[in-house]
């Protein structure tokens, strides 16, 4: 059992971990059928001076992630932007190729896909769990968060975080919960 069950290593008011994401970006100068190059993207580039919504999920092409979690954030992207969110990222412990093909299949146009291929970000967040019971290896626990200038402002980690969890909870990391919390933050600041 995961010793950090139900308690993420990082919490509201903590800084997000510093890692480098291995991404692929389109570069027309490459030419050919696959005009993409590797690009390292740091957490500083993603979070510094920006208000960012993040949601992390167990895996590309998996049922809840594909039917509800990612499509929910994609459909409410403009609402998040209207509430002062600069960008929305989907993180999964998958490689850049899988994340690209998954977004393409779901016709994701707005949410940015962020591959955490080696699980470094998820591990440092305290959200990496074993999913060996499903043949997945290590994956991210499902959560969402709002990050202001690198500091976690809101964090919604699903309950029951344990290695080899028999269920896939999806109760609080959805886009509607995050939107409601952003409204509450704005109301309390007024």
Predicted regions located by residue number:
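Chalcogenol-based redox active-site neighborhoods
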Residues: 1-190
């Amino acid at each position: 059992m995961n010793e950090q069950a139900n308690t993420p290593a990082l919490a509201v008011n903590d800084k997000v971990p510093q890692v480098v994401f291995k991404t692929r970006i389109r570069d027309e100068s490459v030419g050919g059928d696959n005009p993409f190059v590797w690009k390292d993207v740091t957490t500083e580039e993603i979070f510094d001076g920006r208000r960012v919504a993040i949601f992390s999920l167990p895996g590309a092409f998996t049922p809840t992630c594909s039917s509800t979690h990612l499509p929910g954030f994609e459909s409410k992207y403009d609402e998040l932007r209207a509430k002062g969110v600069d960008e929305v990222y989907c993180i999964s412990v998958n490689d850049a190729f899988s994340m690209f093909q998954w977004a393409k299949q779901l016709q994701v146009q707005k949410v940015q896909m962020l591959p955490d291929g080696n699980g470094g970000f998820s591990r440092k967040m305290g959200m990496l769990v074993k999913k060996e019971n499903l043949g997945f290896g290590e994956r991210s626990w499902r959560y969402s968060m709002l990050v202001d200038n690198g500091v976690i402002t809101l964090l919604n980690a699903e309950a029951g975080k344990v290695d080899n969890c028999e269920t896939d909870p999806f109760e609080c990391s959805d886009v509607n919960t995050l939107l409601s919390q952003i409204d509450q933050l704005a109301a309390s600041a007024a």
